[in-house]
């Protein structure tokens, strides 16, 4: 496929999404915009002509596209978008320019109805939207509890305040049990299992919460490591040339940074 076509399609779709958000007075993060575009892709379906021109891979942030990110950076460098508290919005001049004509949307009006469903959903402003992306599309079902129970509890004070160590360890065990069997994951699986054993021991001594400060980093590193493996095995063909460097990065991460 012509690589320029990827960027043309993504550029038109990103501009459309930013205009829709501006028109509806919605300001969300770059990562949530990535997920919204991914959801548009998935709802278009594999047989749609645009499906293959919206290349994504799974990362620690969920579905992510380097092509979307590069087009996003280009718009930022051209002062078309502005940031406010980690959310982004289109400036007035760019909105007027971009909303005049969009050949992609004219050719595929179904995108309009799909985007309306996404941007009129109140869950867009909450974790529920992100969680639904994982529940509906993640390549492994345990990625949802791995991310939104194990990992998110380490960064969300509200989740931590309701933490029950036995329940947390049950989720941990389920994730450990469901890890795929792959030679690139062997070393990580051993480390992840050892971490679980240490957490069990701490919990048996009724010291889980007292040691939470020491638990945070290895749990976070576990998610980041697994996400690097998922990227290798769950990506669109556009990224096939990156597999070698991704494998090297994963091996280095396991060797130097894993729990």
Language model region names:
Residues 1-259:
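Domain-edge interaction signal
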